[in-house]
Amino acid sequence: MEFENIISAADKARILAEALPYIRRFSGSVAVIKYGGNAMTEPALKEGFARDVVLLKLVGIHPVIVHGGGPQINAMLEKVGKKGEFVQGMRVTDKETMDIVEMVLGGHVNKEIVSMINTYGGHAVGVSGRDDHFIKAKKLLVDTPEQNSVDIGQVGTVESIDTGLVKGLIERGCIPVVAPVGVGEKGEAFNINADLVAGKLAEELNAEKLLMMTNIAGVMDKTGNLLTKLTPKRIDGLIADGTLYGGMLPKIASAVEAAVNGVKATHIIDGRLPNALLLEIFTDAGIGSMILGRGEDA
């Protein structure tokens, strides 16, 4: 056996030994994963994500995927000559845009994720929040520095989640893949930020972990240093001084709310890293930023 292969084998053995306590600890638990960013668009990362999700299921963890689809929605809007607009990180969604959002998220994106997971041996099932009306939504009004309660169209916030559908899929050995579209009291569709859906679903499922995949290493301070542990108080300060803004705001808000409301560990991790999920769940060091419901920052 060549020397490099001996090293490779030794590394693999070490990794497995390090992972074993975590496999035992988390077996039988739910991990809600917000899937987005480069991990959804780069072929190698997409395939790696699917393999990692299947592995989680094989070792007894129950992954529940909530996906975004911003780049795909933008591409479709561009095709039809419609410009995307955002307010405080939320997509302005008129009726035409909502039709496109629902088509892209519930159709193309959801089915692609399901197909890829199943290709690697999983049993994924795609659902939208409108299926069985399991995600009830209400209109979201956004406050801006210039104006309070701005109406940005068919954009919603989660009013309630009936977890029966998702729990039923888990009990059947399936991997639920959730498109973040909710339903209003009149049956109308609402575009809901995927981070908000993931956080609320993690709360309602009493998840062990909420993992949010992003295109950054985690939460950074103004000098570019990674903040590995954060409390709500520290996060309030980072928002106040402008360190956190735009699209990070709903992600952070969802992570904090989930941590405060009982999700045992909430993480913002770098989805550009191969095997990011496994690195966070099964290694001593972990990656990214952990959001704590209470306690001291590290």
From Swiss-Prot:
Substrate binds at residues 69-70, 91, 191. Keywords: Amino-acid biosynthesis, Arginine biosynthesis, ATP-binding, Cytoplasm, Kinase, Nucleotide-binding, Transferase. The keyword Ribosomal protein does not apply. It is an enzyme of class 2 (transferase). GO terms for biological process: arginine biosynthetic process via ornithine; L-arginine biosynthetic process. It is found in: Cytoplasm. Pathway: Amino-acid biosynthesis; L-arginine biosynthesis; N(2)-acetyl-L-ornithine from L-glutamate: step 2/4. One of its GO terms (molecular function) is ATP binding. Its EC number is 2.7.2.8. It comes from the Bacteria. It catalyses: N-acetyl-L-glutamate + ATP = N-acetyl-L-glutamyl 5-phosphate + ADP. NCBIfam families: argB. Catalyzes the ATP-dependent phosphorylation of N-acetyl-L-glutamate. Belongs to the acetylglutamate kinase family. ArgB subfamily. This is Acetylglutamate kinase. It comes from Neisseria gonorrhoeae (strain ATCC 700825 / FA 1090).
